[in-house]
Amino acid sequence: MSRSTSSDRRITRRKAILKQAKGFRGRRGTNFKAARDAVRKALLHSYVGRKDKKSDMRQIWITRINAAVRAEGITYSRFIAGMNKAGIQLNRKALSNMAIEDPTAFKAVVEASKKALGV
């Protein structure tokens, strides 16, 4: 019986890792062991980054809304409280886009929020 080796599978696996490490600097892009560790860490960072992106985007939306409502003479927290009282259900992404793309509609929402607060 002939002796079997894992050479084909091993070469394929190593090529795949080195392909993923293409563009990495120094030994991390050419040496298999270093590349394997670098690729693992890079994949972990990309996974975590996809989760963090959601929080970052929400923070950007809130900052944009805050800037837009302060121009109308009200703070962000009072604006959100007024929206809840008025029964306006718009998410922060929609409000942020509205503040940028349709300022007149956003101003109407701010006025409705102010009216609900009695300001």
Curated annotation (Swiss-Prot):
Keyword Transcription regulation in the entry? The reply is no
PROSITE patterns recorded for this chain? RIBOSOMAL_L20
Gene Ontology biological process terms in this record: ribosomal large subunit assembly; translation
* Assigned GO CC terms: ribonucleoprotein complex; ribosome
The UniProt record lists the keyword Transferase: no
GO MF: rRNA binding; structural constituent of ribosome
What InterPro entries does the entry give?
Ribosomal_bL20, RIBOSOMAL_L20_CS, Ribosomal_protein_bL20_C
Sorted alphabetically, the keyword list is: Ribonucleoprotein, Ribosomal protein, RNA-binding, rRNA-binding
- Read off the Gene3D superfamilies from this record: 6.10.160.10, Ribosomal protein L20
> Which family is this protein grouped under?
Belongs to the bacterial ribosomal protein bL20 family.
Q: What HAMAP family does the record point to?
A: Ribosomal_bL20
Q: What does this protein do?
A: Binds directly to 23S ribosomal RNA and is necessary for the in vitro assembly process of the 50S ribosomal subunit. It is not involved in the protein synthesizing functions of that subunit.
Task: State the protein's name.
Answer: Large ribosomal subunit protein bL20
Please report the organism this UniProt entry assigns to the protein.
Treponema denticola (strain ATCC 35405 / DSM 14222 / CIP 103919 / JCM 8153 / KCTC 15104)
